[in-house]
Every structure is written in structure tokens, then in C-alpha cells.
Swiss-Prot record:
It comes from the Eukaryota. It is found in: Plastid, Chloroplast. Component of the chloroplast ribosome (chloro-ribosome), a dedicated translation machinery responsible for the synthesis of chloroplast genome-encoded proteins, including proteins of the transcription and translation machinery and components of the photosynthetic apparatus. Gene3D superfamilies: 3.30.190.20, 3.40.50.790. This is Large ribosomal subunit protein uL1c. It comes from Spinacia oleracea (Spinach). Residues 1-72 form a transit peptide. HAMAP family: Ribosomal_uL1_B. Component of the chloroplast large ribosomal subunit (LSU). Mature 70S chloroplast ribosomes of higher plants consist of a small (30S) and a large (50S) subunit. The 30S small subunit contains 1 molecule of ribosomal RNA (16S rRNA) and 24 different proteins. The 50S large subunit contains 3 rRNA molecules (23S, 5S and 4.5S rRNA) and 33 different proteins.
Length: 352
């Protein structure tokens, strides 16, 4: 007895259109494929067991025997088909593969500070203070001096995180502060001037004084100075040094007090301890305020002067809370967090 031929189907390549030609009650149920799968020609097999997870064809006719078909799509050997329908069913999303992670380069590839190996010296001195504790100015300075263990005299540094964004002109901060007790180091000053200003600069204690000949020396690579001061009438010629002095932070500017008609006063101020500071792109100001061999009272006076200068020169575009955090540290030591309220309310002694 001849058996009846199975119903015919019309199939195509990697397509979502399957057409049953004879029985309209024939239903298809599609399940997601990986996006990087490559399909070959589809083959049709008649099986009595359950279908695979790609495409199911089931006849809904009321017949004694249900007819099930399984359509098997051949994929590349390396492709793995994942059952994502249950995960994406509720949200109705489409299953996608995560994009491959690109390897990090440069500073981004470095481990986090918490994952780096600290020296034994650093780990020992770090135990002297609590990490999240906020200290008043006097206690913080005392701890900073206790945690100094290097073979050289470290610099005391203040680090203030401010609620400003320097990419906006009205939120930039660049100013100077005169430290009453000095910086603790010798500053070598060069002056660009002409005429009588040259004699005034030499009398005030400038280390290097010159005019156009000094400009030519700087173009030739001469950089043996820490600060460059220029008179206003020399700025047209100094402009040609922008590419050389700018990246080093030595370009004279009025905001820094290095472009002035009174060169003698400027030389004296920088010799005594005038420090220039500016906010970096992350909104943090870094200011040195002395050496660790200073007395605590002298460091306190200098630190108070830096705080007052940052507060006085608050940008006009700063909004909300201006001070976000404040820390002090030595050059090679851990930072000590300051209590901002006590820091701003501190009143120096009248004899300071």
C-alpha cells in the first residue's frame, strides 16, 4: 500500500519567509538566531520527536496523528546558538552579542591605585592617620610632619577640589598668593626689559636680565630660570616664545603678576615667596606652601594664606558649594583630609 506523500513546503535561504502551500492551519514559530550566523540551504526532515530551537512547523489539523517537522539550518562550525528567547521574552528585546572589549592603552591600562603595590614605608606611615577622618588644620599639619620619612626635605602641598569647570571662561581660576613665611627654596628669576628697567631689575635681585638678546637665547634652548618676568613694552617680542614657554608654564601673563611695569616690586615678591596657582582640567588646585622643616606655626600661616587666596579669587561663574574637598600632603606622603567647615572658620592668631 502506497504511503501518502508529505505536504510540500516552499523554503528559501536565510530568510524569515516560509510558505506552506496546501494547509493554511500550518503554523510557524521563529526563534532568534545569532547575528553572526551564516546559513546554508535549509533541509527538511520528518521526525516524531520535538523540534530544534530555530524554526518549528506544527500542523494544527484534528487528525489522529500530528505531523511534526524539524527544519535544520546549517551554521558555521564555530558559531554557537544560545537559547535567548526566555531571557528576552518579557522585555521584548532582540538578542544581540556584546561588542568585543578593546584593550586599554596608556594610563588607562595601569591598575587602580588601590590595586598597586605600595612600598613598606608608605604602608607604615599611612597607619598614623585614618583614611576617611577629617582633621582640623593644626592636627593635619602635625600628622603631615610625623609621616615624613624620606632622606630629603619634602615640600608641603595643598590640594583643593573646587566645584568649577575650567572649560568655561567664567569658571577659570588663575591667581597668585604671597606666602608670609616663604616657600623654603631659592627662586631663580629672569627679567625681559629694556632701558632703565634693566637697572631696576638688577638692583631688586633678578638673576638674569636682558632684552632681545635674552629672547634669542631662550629660542636657542636656554631655560635656566624658574620664573620669567617681562615689562609691558616687551610683550610684542615675547609673543614669539609662546610655543617654548607655554607648555612649561613660564609664559609671562598679567594674571600671574609676571607682566608688570614695576619689575623691581615683582622680583622682590617672587623672591620672598609669591606663588602662582591655577586650576587643572579636573577642577583641582595644587599649591605648595612651604617645606616640612618649617615650624608648624609657619606652615599654618602659609596654609591659611593659600586658603584665603583661593576663596578671594572665586570665579564669578562658580555655582553652588564652592569647596568640595581639601587635602594636604608632603611630596612623598599620603594625603590628609581637612574639615572644610573648620578650615574656612579658622581665625589666625592676632600676632601671626
Amino acid at each position: 500500500m502506497a504511503t501518502a506523500a508529505p505536504p510540500s513546503l516552499s523554503l528559501c535561504y536565510a530568510s524569515s519567509s516560509f510558505q506552506y502551500q496546501q494547509d493554511p492551519s500550518f503554523q510557524t514559530h521563529f526563534k532568534p538566531l545569532l547575528l553572526n550566523s551564516s546559513l546554508c540551504r535549509l533541509t527538511l526532515n520528518q521526525r516524531e520527536r520535538s523540534c530544534l530551537k530555530w524554526v518549528d512547523f506544527t500542523s494544527q489539523k484534528q487528525s489522529p496523528k500530528s505531523v511534526s517537522f524539524r527544519v535544520l539550518a546549517a551554521v558555521a562550525a564555530e558559531a554557537e546558538v544560545a537559547d535567548m528567547e526566555e531571557e528576552e521574552g518579557e522585555s521584548g528585546g532582540v538578542a544581540t552579542l556584546p561588542s568585543p572589549t578593546k584593550p586599554k592603552k596608556g594610563k588607562a591600562a595601569l591598575p587602580l591605585k588601590s590595586d598597586r603595590t605600595r612600598s613598606k614605608r608608605f604602608l607604615e606611615i599611612q597607619k598614623l592617620r585614618e583614611i576617611k577622618q577629617e582633621y582640623d588644620l593644626k592636627t593635619a599639619l602635625s600628622l603631615m610632619k610625623q609621616m615624613s620619612s624620606t632622606k630629603f626635605v619634602e615640600t608641603a602641598e595643598a590640594h583643593f577640589r573646587l566645584n568649577i569647570d575650567p572649560k568655561y571662561n567664567d569658571q577659570q581660576l588663575r591667581a597668585t598668593v604671597s606666602l608670609p613665611k616663604g616657600t623654603g627654596k631659592t627662586v631663580k628669576i629672569a627679567v625681559l626689559a629694556q632701558g632703565d628697567k634693566i637697572d631696576e631689575a638688577k638692583a631688586a635681585g633678578a638673576d638674569i636680565v636682558g632684552g632681545e638678546e635674552l629672547i634669542e637665547q631662550i629660542k636657542g634652548g636656554f631655560m635656566d630660570f624658574d620664573k620669567l618676568i617681562a615689562t609691558s613694552d616687551m610683550m610684542a617680542k615675547v609673543a614669539s616664545l609662546g610655543r617654548i614657554l607655554g607648555p612649561r608654564g613660564l609664559m609671562p601673563t598679567p594674571k600671574a603678576g609676571t607682566v608688570t611695569p614695576n619689575v623691581a616690586q615683582a622680583v622682590e615678591e617672587f623672591k620672598k615667596g609669591k606663588v602662582e596657582f591655577r586650576v587643572d582640567k579636573t577642577g583641582i588646585v595644587h599649591i605648595p606652601f612651604g617645606k616640612l622643616n618649617f615650624e608648624e606655626e609657619d606652615l599654618l600661616i602659609n596654609l591659611f594664606a593659600t586658603i584665603k587666596s583661593v576663596e578671594t579669587n572665586k570665579p564669578t561663574g562658580a555655582k553652588g558649594v564652592y569647596w568640595k574637598s581639601a587635602h594636604i600632603s608632603s611630596s612623598m606622603g599620603p594625603s590628609i583630609r581637612l574639615n572644610i567647615r573648620e578650615m574656612l572658620d579658622y581665625k589666625p592668631p592676632s600676632n601671626a
